[in-house]
Regions:
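Conserved alpha-helical substructure of the radical SAM core
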Residues: 1-92, 100-102
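Active-site beta-loop-alpha junctions enriched in small/polar residues
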Residues: 62-64, 95-97, 118-120, 160-162, ...
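Distinct, well-ordered alpha-helical segments
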Residues: 71-74, 100-107, 166-176
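Non-cysteine beta-strand/loop elements that form the S-adenosyl-L-methionine
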Residues: 102-121, 183-193
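Short loop/turn motifs at secondary-structure junctions
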Residues: 23, 53, 86, 109, ...
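Radical SAM enzyme [4Fe-4S]-AdoMet core and its adjacent flexible, acidic
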Residues: 123-140, 144, 149-294
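Structural preference for beta-strand elements that scaffold enzyme active sites
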Residues: 11-13, 56-58, 89-91, 112-114, ...
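Generic structural signal for hydrophobic
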Residues: 49, 77, 105-106, 146, ...
């Protein structure tokens, strides 16, 4: 049974760091200068999440593969619980730039991996995923590696729609040459206007009508290739998430905005009180299970 003192939703996003080896103008994650969660705190968080018997954890950042302790952390997190029940399903959200040798150490402990490709048009993709020129090829190579050699790991491909890629997003799956390499889920994201996304919304954000038009075209592509399509809309963001940030602050989404509600270790009573109404348990579960279904 879960520890009754830890009244957390079933699905948690663990943002371990802000640091990244890309500088994407639409990023909604922590600012790059935010200090990374140290190893001791990261393992304390994992211990707490396991005691709470959360059912799924998305590990993100920043770029989590930059952390030297990541392999040990996901191994610990994914272990069966002391009761004998399965550990939480672990999702790694990564930009895909880590060397294959690094990924081979991490992949055995994952249920899902989430990677991004923004456009079939290379120039559009490079304007969105800035910092490393061959990024798209690296992601497609990782996709092939996972689908051919790590069959237990499911793959979600993500595409964020902005003014930069509105004409090329719908053709992303055309870059995947063989059906056997296709992702299990392709998720289309409306740009979240948080952090860097908020800084750059005036020149990046598209209207709801433009976004829905892109979604319609993506749906046709996904149906043609037999890939499950999921869609994130900003209107559904509130109540769907509980984030743990690098400083161990718990973050919820109220009216589309991030709100910090306390330290995970020091403010548990306050967090429990604030979570009531701030996280919709049905929406939280539906968001995770829709994006990362139990296939």
């Amino acid at each position: 049974m879960p520890d009754p003192a830890l009244r957390l939703p079933a699905y948690v996003d663990l943002r371990l760091l802000g640091r990244c080896n890309l500088s994407c103008p639409f990023c909604f994650g922590p600012r790059h200068e935010v200090p990374s969660m140290d190893e001791k705190d990261a393992f304390r968080v994992v211990e707490l999440l396991r005691r709470a018997e959360v059912r799924g954890v998305v590990i993100s950042g920043g770029e989590p593969t930059l952390l030297p302790y990541l392999t040990d952390l996901v191994a610990e997190l994914s272990e069966p619980l002391p009761s004998g029940a399965p550990g939480p399903r672990v999702v790694l959200s990564t930009n895909g730039l880590a060397p294959v040798v690094t990924m081979k150490r991490i992949l055995p402990h994952l249920s899902w991996i989430a990677v991004p490709v923004e456009s079939a048009d290379l120039e559009q993709h490079q304007r969105m995923r800035t910092g490393v020129a061959p990024h798209r090829d690296r992601v497609l190579g990782l996709l092939k590696e996972v689908r051919t050699r790590h069959g237990h790991v499911r793959v979600k491909l993500g595409t964020v729609v902005t003014r930069l890629n509105a004409t090329g997003a719908h053709s992303v799956l055309d870059l995947v040459q063989k059906d056997a390499w296709l992702p299990h889920v392709w998720k289309i994201y409306q740009m979240s206007e948080t952090n860097y996304g908020a800084d750059n919304r005036d020149w990046l954000a598209v209207s709801d009508d433009v976004f829905e038009d892109v979604v319609e075209r993506c749906a046709k592509t996904a149906a043609d290739r037999g890939v499950q399509l999921q869609v994130y809309r900003n209107s559904t963001r509130s109540g769907s998430y509980l984030f743990v940030d690098p400083d161990c602050q718990v973050v919820v989404i109220d009216e589309g905005r991030e709100r910090r509600i306390g330290d995970l270790f020091e403010d548990q009573e306050k967090i429990a009180a604030d979570l009531h109404g701030a996280v919709d348990l049905t929406r939280n579960a539906g968001n995770f299970s829709g994006t990362y279904p139990d296939l």
